């Protein structure tokens, strides 16, 4: 197989998961077969495909297995950059946890949302892939937990633990506030948390908090330094607010028409295609496989 690049020198591809590589449709999370083939061909050609997501590391590993690239992909970026795992060395390139002051902020946010009477859950993610239900504010907390687990997806193997306090030994890397109703989070942040720049909208249901100085963009920069590459070798693909730091890197920046305006403004290409399909199309547009 030979590779011809329309954008000379591209060899590293950093791709968001939910809403980009992965589409949620008919109560299922799916990757288009054409996109799977494009990723496989890309990797076979010698290029590097790295998932950069808010999800935890084991979720990315499962996606790599589904794509058939678990032996080829050199890194994974998880928890919005709080975890960067070097798959070749089997070690962390980066791991950062929430601080005691972050714990205070988490409790403050929960108290505010309780007063506003939103139906939501505060879920915490640990460095060891553990997921904790910290606070559920809903008429039926058990039904809410089941709804959240269903939303996480069929490729996720979570063992949820309930906790009633925050401890440093949990090694927490991320907090997520998940709302039962969609599109509440943007107004909540705008009206009540305008001074909290680290609160990032990550889906139609959620916003998140990660450790200070953590982002997908920072994670990409760490990889750039380790493997000694430049932006001219990089394509980034994303669809949401937590992808904005990622779009500070790369020479080709790809999203679709459903992305927020500030992401589309940074993009070099905006596709009128749904999630997953636009990733496959972008890879095929920039590479021709013979």
From Swiss-Prot:
Enzyme Commission code: 3.1.3.-
Name this polypeptide is given: Putative phosphatase MPN_427
GO cellular component: cytosol
Annotated active site: 16
Annotated binding of phosphate, by residue: 17, 53-54, 216, 242
Organism: Mycoplasma pneumoniae (strain ATCC 29342 / M129 / Subtype 1) (Mycoplasmoides pneumoniae)
Record keywords: Hydrolase, Magnesium, Metal-binding
Cofactor(s) required, per the database record: Mg(2+)
């Amino acid at each position: 197989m030979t590779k011809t690049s329309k954008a000379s020198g591209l060899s590293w591809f950093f791709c968001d998961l939910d809403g980009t590589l992965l589409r949620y449709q008919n109560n299922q999370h799916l990757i288009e077969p054409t996109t799977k083939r494009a990723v496989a061909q890309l990797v076979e050609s010698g290029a590097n495909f790295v998932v950069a997501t808010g999800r935890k590391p084991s979720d990315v590993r499962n996606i790599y297995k589904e794509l058939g690239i678990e032996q080829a992909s050199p890194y994974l970026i998880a928890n919005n950059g709080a975890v960067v795992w070097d798959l070749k060395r089997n070690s962390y390139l980066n791991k950062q946890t929430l601080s005691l002051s972050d714990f205070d902020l988490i409790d403050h946010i929960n108290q505010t949302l309780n007063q506003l009477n939103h139906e939501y859950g505060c879920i915490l993610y640990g460095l060891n892939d553990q997921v904790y239900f910290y606070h559920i504010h809903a008429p039926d907390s058990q039904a809410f937990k089941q709804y959240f687990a269903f939303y996480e997806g069929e490729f996720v193997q979570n063992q949820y633990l309930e906790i009633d306090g925050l401890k440093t030994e949990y090694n927490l890397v991320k907090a997520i506030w998940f709302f039962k109703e969609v599109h509440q989070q943007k107004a909540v942040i705008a009206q009540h948390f305008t001074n909290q720049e680290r609160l990032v909208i990550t889906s139609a249901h959620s916003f998140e908090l990660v450790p200070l100085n953590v982002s997908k963009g920072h994670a990409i920069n760490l990889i750039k330094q380790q493997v000694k590459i430049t932006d001219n070798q990089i394509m980034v693909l994303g669809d949401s607010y937590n992808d904005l730091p990622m779009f500070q890197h790369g020479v080709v920046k790809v999203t679709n028409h459903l992305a927020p305006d500030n992401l589309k403004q940074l993009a070099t290409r905006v596709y009128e295609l749904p999630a997953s399909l636009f990733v496959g199309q972008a890879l095929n547009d920039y590479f021709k496989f013979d």
